[in-house]
UniProtKB/Swiss-Prot annotation:
InterPro entries: Apolipo_AcylTrfase, C-N_Hydrolase, C-N_Hydrolase_sf, LNT_N. This is Apolipoprotein N-acyltransferase. The gene is lnt. It is found in: Cell inner membrane. The active site is at residues 269, 330, 382. It comes from Pseudomonas aeruginosa (strain UCBPP-PA14). The lineage of its organism: Bacteria, Pseudomonadati, Pseudomonadota, Gammaproteobacteria, Pseudomonadales.
Length: 511
């Protein structure tokens, strides 16, 4: 098995395969032990490698992970961006090759500055710290791409009890630590004290996760809210067709009018497919309907802001009418779907760079939450719900979470189900109920433990009825966010860096 840790193609191909295991640990498959196996194979494959070889070993791992785990991007480019098969394949491969460097550069840093082969316990801790740093970096760099985090595999796994304590970050840290410790355990057998400490580090977090699973960190803030969520199932090719606007508005109106004994009616992202000011009459009429039902109607709608120079800015928004108030403007935009980077160069080259409604501006920070039926509602539009820290900041001020989306762009791929899993994790992290309304699925109600209690299947029109309970109180994660864990990771990385620099004087510290 030494070939795994040697430079060359056999090790690189194993890293590619190990990376491709990543999506199998996540939704919709959820074979969560594969997350540990995947990372363990990468850790073993980096042992003893020089910097350049480690960089390419990490790159191949990343190519496997993103190539398999974000293959739904091809669907968006080909099916809805009108790109030919060769062009869509080229763009998909180019994207995958680029984001694979998220793993390549940390692998190089590990080999050059942090790895200590003669300190198995300290090495495992430093590797887990670097893994956490990588996931944090991915959530921020170039607006972020926080997809395929290892911690999502534990949504309903043994570590679920740790998620309200440290978020998906703590789950990822423990998985990476467990993977490295399992690789290093054979080296600890001759050393009784080190072996005992290694077993405590390996088994302790899993025992804590099981012990805390189901613990109630938050409690009810009032009576249950009766919710109706509408899933219109509008085909993407009809979504922005001007000739289909009236039909879509009539559909959502007609599905909502018969609903009785309801507190919240929720429509998906851009369910109103025209600008808010152009739909003012329609929204006003629906607000009157909601008032008559003593309910609030919350819908996605694009928003126009007229500027002093006569120009306009456009936003992806959510607005409330009836028994509530507020309009929220999306802050985390999807590249190419909602804005085009370098648009002066790319606009018009191919249809994918000129999609409908792909010229949105970013909403301002520190917007007030939505208000409905006397409660604060934390809004997330589509992609925003995948950002743990961003979501936590809003959740801490709220009693109910709301996410609206249009995942039609991703067809029958695994993308929408990965997206749903991340939304479930936000509910678990915050200890709050979440309402999720989508155009074509999965629309659902998620409880504070991340479990789906009501849902409408994908690709069908439907009306979901259920109840959510407004919650108050803060989980440890909402109180402290990632900072305690990030501080620990920083100490571990500094320790590894100093230990590496002082290697001649090091005396098997931690190992």
């Amino acid at each position: 098995m030494r070939w795994i840790s040697r430079p060359g193609w056999p090790g690189h191909l194993l890293a590619l395969a190990a990376g491709a295991l990543t999506p199998l640990a996540l939704a919709p498959f959820v074979y969560w032990p594969l997350a540990i196996l995947s990372i363990a194979l990468l850790y073993l494959g980096l042992r003893g490698l020089p910097g350049k070889s480690a960089l390419w070993r990490g790159w191949w791992y990343g190519f496997g992970a993103f190539g398999a785990g974000t293959s739904w991007i091809y669907v968006s480019i080909h099916d809805y961006g009108a790109a030919s098969v060769p062009l869509a394949s080229f763009l998909m491969l180019g994207f995958t090759a680029g984001v694979a460097f998220f793993f390549a550069l940390p692998a190089w840093l590990w080999a050059r500055c942090l790895r200590r082969d003669n300190a198995p316990l300290g090495d495992a801790l430093a590797f887990a710290a670097l893994w956490l740093a990588l996931e944090l970096f991915r959530s921020w760099f170039l607006t972020g791409f926080p997809w395929l985090y290892a911690g999502y595999s534990q949504l309903q796994g043994p570590l679920a009890g740790l998620v309200p304590v440290g978020g998906v970050w703590l789950s990822s840290f423990v998985i990476a630590l467990s993977a490295a410790l399992l690789v290093n355990l054979p080296r600890l057998f001759p050393h009784g004290a080190s072996l005992l400490l290694g077993l405590v580090l390996l088994l302790g977090p899993w025992a804590a996760g099981l012990y805390l699973k189901g613990h109630a960190w938050t409690h009810s803030a009032g009576e249950p809210l009766r919710v109706v969520a509408i899933q219109g199932n509008i085909a993407q090719e009809l979504k922005w067709d001007p000739n289909q606007v009236r039909a879509q508005l009539d559909l959502y109106r007609d599905l909502s009018l018969p609903q009785q004994d309801v507190d919240l009616i929720v429509w998906p992202e851009t369910a109103v497919p025209i600008l808010q000011d152009m739909a003012s009459g329609y929204l006003g009429a629906m607000g009157q309907v909601a008032d008559e039902k003593n309910a609030a109607l919350i819908t996605g709608v694009p928003v126009r802001e007229r500027l002093a120079d006569g120009k306009s800015r456009y936003f992806n928004g959510i607005t409330v009418v009836g028994e509530g108030a507020g309009t929220y403007l999306k802050q985390k935009l999807v590249p190419f779907g909602e804005y085009v980077p370098l648009q002066d160069l790319l606009r018009g080259l191919i249809a994918f760079f000129d999609l409908p409604m792909s010229d949105f501006a970013r909403g301002p920070a520190d917007q007030p939450l939505l208000k409905a039926k006397g409660y604060e509602i934390a809004p997330y539009i589509c992609y925003e719900v995948v950002y743990p820290e961003f979501a936590a900041a809003l959740a801490a001020q709220s009693q109910v979470l709301l996410t609206v989306s249009n995942d039609t762009w991703f067809g029958t791929s695994i993308g929408p189900l990965q997206h749903l899993q991340m939304a479930q994790m936000r509910a678990l992290e915050s200890g709050r109920w979440m309402i999720r309304a989508t155009n074509n699925g999965v629309t659902g109600l998620i409880d504070p433990y991340g479990r789906i209690v009501r849902q409408i299947p994908q690709f069908q029109q439907g009306i979901l009825r259920g109840e959510v309970i407004p919650m108050q109180g803060l989980t440890p994660y909402l109180q402290y966010r990632v900072w305690p864990l990030a501080g620990l990771a920083g100490v571990l990385l500094l320790w590894a860096l100093l230990g590496r620099q002082l290697r001649p004087q090091e005396r098997r510290l931690f190992g």
